[in-house]
C-alpha cells in the first residue's frame, strides 16, 4: 500500500536511532559516566533555580554558561554556541553548511549521526575507511578530499566506536584544505589531546564537545561548539532559539564551577580503562587500545552470541554489527562493574 503523497519517499529506508532498551543490572553500552551524580551538586543546582525560571523562556544563547566556558577555554563568548547535546549542533552544522548540492566527508567506522544528519539534510556523504588497525590513512583521506571537494569534514577524536586518536599534526594537514573541519572531542577528557588551540590560527576549524560523558550530564542533553565568530553566527541563524532549557544551563554552570569533582572521576575511569584492557587481553581477547571511556573488543564470530549471553545476565554492552560484527564496545564502568563483567566473560568464554 502506497503512503500518502506528503510522506517523503527518500525517508522510507531511513532507520531511526534506537538504543536497545532492555532490563539490566550493569549498563556498559552508551559510554556514560558510571558514577552517581554528586548529591551536593544536585542540591546546588536546585538552589539556583528560582520560581520565575520555569514560566519564562531560557536565555537563547545561554549567556552565563557561555561566559564560564569562554573563561575556561581561553576564547571569546562569541566563539561558543550551546546546544541540546552535541547531536543538535551536528545537525545545525549541516543546516548551515550542508544541504542539497553540498558534500560532507567522514570516516568509517565512526559516529553514526554524521551520516544520519547528512541524509536528513540531503547532504551528499562520503566516507574514508580507517586502516585495519583503525588508524587514519592520511594519503587516502587526501585523495578523497581532492576527489569529492567536501564542504564539511567530520573527525571524531578520539573516535567512537574505536577509541583511537589522530595526532595534532595530522589535523593540521586536514585543515590545509578549503573545507570546514569539525573535530568532535566528545571524549577529550579521557585522552588529554585537543585541537582547540588551533582555533587561533585556523578559521575553518570547529570543535565539538559535550557534558554527557566526563561531566555526567547525559540525561540533561548539553553540548557546545567552539569556532570562529563567523561560523558561530551561521550556526545561530539555524539553531532553535530556546534550545537549551534553564535547568541544563544552570547545571552546566555548577558542573564547571566544580571541575575538581569530575577530574577525580576521570582519573579513576582512565585507570580502570587500562586495567580492563589488560584483563580483557588476558582472557585471550583482542581489545583495541583506547583513548576514550570505552574499549572496542574483537570477539570473533561469537560476538553477537556473547552480547546476548551478557544481556541474559543483566550486563549491557554495545553490539555494533555491520563491518564491526565481530566486535563489542564496552564502556568502562566502576571497578565493581568491571569485575563482574570480567567474571561473566570468563565463564562464557
Swiss-Prot record:
Coiled coil: none annotated. It holds the Pfam family Aminotran_1_2. The modification N6-(pyridoxal phosphate)lysine is found at residue 213. GO terms for biological process: L-histidine biosynthetic process. Keywords: Amino-acid biosynthesis, Aminotransferase, Histidine biosynthesis, Pyridoxal phosphate, Transferase. GO terms for molecular function: histidinol-phosphate transaminase activity; pyridoxal phosphate binding. Pathway: Amino-acid biosynthesis; L-histidine biosynthesis; L-histidine from 5-phospho-alpha-D-ribose 1-diphosphate: step 7/9. It is an enzyme of class 2 (transferase). Gene3D superfamilies: Aspartate Aminotransferase, domain 1, Type I PLP-dependent aspartate aminotransferase-like (Major domain). Its cofactor is pyridoxal 5'-phosphate. Belongs to the class-II pyridoxal-phosphate-dependent aminotransferase family. Histidinol-phosphate aminotransferase subfamily. This is Histidinol-phosphate aminotransferase 1.
Amino acid at each position: 500500500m502506497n503512503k500518502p503523497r506528503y510522506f517523503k519517499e527518500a525517508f522510507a529506508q531511513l532507520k531511526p536511532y534506537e538504543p536497545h532498551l532492555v532490563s539490566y543490572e550493569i549498563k556498559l553500552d552508551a559510554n556514560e559516566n558510571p558514577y552517581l551524580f554528586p548529591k551536593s551538586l544536585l542540591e546546588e543546582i536546585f538552589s539556583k533555580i528560582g520560581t520565575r525560571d520555569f514560566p519564562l523562556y531560557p536565555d537563547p544563547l545561554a549567556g552565563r554558561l557561555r561566559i564560564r566556558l569562554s573563561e575556561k577555554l581561553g576564547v571569546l563568548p562569541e566563539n561558543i554556541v550551546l546546544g541540546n547535546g552535541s547531536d543538535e549542533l551536528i545537525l545545525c552544522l549541516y543546516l548551515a553548511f550542508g544541504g542539497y548540492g553540498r558534500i560532507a566527508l567522514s570516516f568509517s567506522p565512526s559516529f553514526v549521526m554524521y551520516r544520519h544528519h547528512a541524509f536528513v539534510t540531503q547532504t551528499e556523504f562520503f566516507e574514508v575507511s580507517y586502516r585495519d588497525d583503525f588508524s587514519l590513512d592520511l594519503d587516502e583521506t587526501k585523495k578523497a578530499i581532492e576527489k569529492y571537494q567536501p564542504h564539511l569534514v567530520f573527525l571524531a577524536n578520539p573516535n567512537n566506536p574505536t577509541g583511537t586518536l589522530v595526532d595534532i599534526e595530522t589535523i593540521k594537514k586536514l585543515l590545509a584544505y578549503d573545507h570546514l573541519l569539525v573535530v568532535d572531542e566528545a571524549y577529550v577528557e579521557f585522552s588529554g589531546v585537543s585541537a582547540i588551540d588551533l582555533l587561533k590560527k585556523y578559521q575553518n576549524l570547529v570543535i565539538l564537545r559535550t557534558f554527557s560523558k566526563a561531566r555526567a550530564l547525559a540525561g540533561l542533553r548539553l553540548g557546545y561548539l567552539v569556532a570562529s565568530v563567523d561560523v558561530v553566527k551561521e550556526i545561530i541563524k539555524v539553531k532553535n532559539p530556546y534550545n537549551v532549557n534553564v535547568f541544563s544551563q544552570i547545571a552546566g554552570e555548577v558542573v564547571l564551577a566544580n571541575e575538581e569533582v569530575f577530574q577525580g572521576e576521570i582519573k579513576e575511569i582512565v585507570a580502570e580503562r587500562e586495567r580492563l584492557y589488560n584483563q580483557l587481553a588476558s582472557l585471550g581477547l583482542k581489545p583495541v587500545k583506547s583513548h576514550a571511556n570505552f574499549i572496542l573488543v574483537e570477539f570473533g564470530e561469537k560476538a553477537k552470541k556473547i552480547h546476548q549471553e551478557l544481556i541474559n545476565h543483566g550486563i549491557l554492552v554495545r553490539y555494533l554489527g555491520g563491518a564491526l560484527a565481530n566486535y563489542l564496545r564496552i564502556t568502562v564502568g566502576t571497578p565493581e562493574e568491571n569485575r563482574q563483567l570480567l567474571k561473566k566473560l570468563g565463564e562464557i568464554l
